[in-house]
């Protein structure tokens, strides 16, 4: 079975657990560091319209709307999108990364910015999505990506791009169907961005006590 299909099947099976996890603020890394980090990075640019890709149950979209942005969310998992709509109204729709890469029309044709927050897991679909996103953005549009910091992998295993074994260890709920995910080195991220984007800034949010990096945020602008 293709990795992309396994990833989608896992998220569909775990949608209810994920919704409950986010609703109850059960991920310390997010509540302590990374949620604020991505919101602050976007707020510093303050785009008028923004597309939240891989929005899940919609927490980030809702937060950005409270800050005056016209935020919209898309996700491949229908159950997550339905939950987001129930909480916040019809600012969400179902769309997979392959559909976006194929040019699927959304509720708004162009956005000032897009954000992908801890939602780049596959190899090929990630590359195709990032390559295709300028078609959804205005000229000199912004792309914000928050993902696992490369040092998190470097500290545990060899520092090479490739598929890594995933798990739901550490989650408070009974998640199932762990999947492999694709890790990229910093060099490979830069190569992926180089054709369509300028790298404007890189942020490295750290844990307030351990001072270890919790994520990396790439702030990009289309060429």
Predicted segments with their positions:
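Conserved S-adenosyl-L-methionine
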Residues: 198-208
């Amino acid at each position: 079975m293709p990795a992309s299909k396994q990833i989608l099947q896992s998220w569909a099976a775990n949608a209810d657990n994920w919704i409950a996890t986010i609703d109850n603020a059960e991920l310390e890394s997010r509540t302590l560091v990374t949620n604020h980090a991505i919101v602050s990075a976007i707020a510093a640019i303050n785009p008028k319209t923004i597309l939240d890709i891989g929005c899940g149950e919609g927490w980030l979209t809702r937060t950005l709307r409270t800050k005056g942005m016209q935020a919209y969310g898309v996700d491949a998992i229908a159950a997550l999108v339905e939950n987001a709509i129930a909480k916040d109204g019809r600012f969400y729709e179902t769309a997979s990364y392959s559909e976006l890469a194929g040019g699927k029309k959304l509720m708004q044709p162009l956005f000032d910015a897009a954000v992908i927050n801890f939602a780049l897991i596959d190899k090929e679909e990630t590359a195709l999505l990032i390559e295709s996103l300028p078609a959804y953005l205005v000229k000199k549009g912004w792309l914000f990506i928050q993902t696992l910091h490369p040092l998190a992998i470097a500290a545990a295993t060899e520092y090479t791009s490739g598929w890594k074994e995933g798990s739901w260890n550490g989650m408070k709920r009974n998640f199932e169907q762990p999947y492999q995910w694709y890790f990229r080195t910093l060099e490979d991220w830069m190569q992926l961005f180089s054709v369509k984007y300028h790298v404007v800034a890189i942020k490295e949010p750290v844990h307030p006590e351990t001072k270890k990096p919790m994520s990396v945020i790439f702030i990009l602008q289309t060429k």
